[in-house]
Design a protein with these regions (language model features):
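Coil-to-beta-strand transition motifs
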Residues: 36, 48-49
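Short N-terminal amphipathic alpha-helices
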Residues: 41, 49-54
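Cys/His-clustered metal-coordination modules, chiefly Zn-binding fingers
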Residues: 32-39
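Extended charged
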Residues: 1-15, 20-29, 44-47, 62-72, ...
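Histidine-centered catalytic micro-motifs used for acid/base chemistry in nuclease
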Residues: 52-58, 75
């Protein structure tokens, strides 16, 4: 999972946008800030994608404490699988957990190249993996298939060409963190 870095000078903050009043604008700005990548599943956001403004802590949604730091652009399916504040108490079941902006998120959530699974190195990190359903069967298969495609690019064109291609086409790249881990490249 790739860490999301929030911008303290985001237009969302500087213009004082609020949810739900400015929901569409917030979603568009979050998509751009996240380079058109789902904050949870690292899947590409396209014009045809169904995207939600996700409230990481669902208990804050539409309260006075809800703010930019709690909002992420996520694929609708990822949001559905996570559940809501009323859906089977998933939020309460997975406390203690780290959030997607945590400074050492990428060191605490690891990727197993063999199985295609994410795992946390501690309880809080594993709770995030479980809470976000990062090891959903279909998602895991997508990651493995994407790795094969990128491996083919590397075999045909070399690592340097492929890395430069991925950097130039950053908004088209899925599963960035996994590619960084597997191929030892920085995207």
């Amino acid at each position: 999972m790739k860490r999301i870095i929030k911008n303290p000078d985001s237009v969302i903050v500087t213009e004082g946008l609020s949810y739900p009043k400015d929901k569409v604008r917030i979603r568009e700005l979050l998509e751009k800030e996240q380079q058109y990548i789902c904050a949870y599943w690292e899947d590409r956001i396209t014009a045809s994608s169904s995207i939600d403004v996700e409230h990481f802590n669902p208990l804050l949604k539409e309260t006075s404490q809800d703010s930019y730091d709690n909002w992420f652009a996520v694929c609708h399916r990822a949001n559905l699988m996570k559940g809501t504040k009323n859906a089977d108490s998933r939020w309460e079941q997975h406390q203690l957990l780290i959030d997607p902006t945590h400074t050492d998120l990428e060191q605490r959530i690891c990727y197993d190249k063999e199985s295609g699974d994410y795992f946390g190195i501690d309880t809080a990190a594993q709770n995030l993996v479980d809470y976000l359903n990062l090891n959903d069967h279909e998602l895991r298969e997508d990651r493995i298939d994407y790795e094969v495609v990128i491996n083919d690019y590397i075999r045909e064109n070399g690592i340097e060409w492929t890395t430069n291609f991925l950097k130039r086409n950053r908004s088209q790249v899925r599963f960035r963190r996994i590619l960084e881990i597997i191929f030892d490249i920085q995207l």
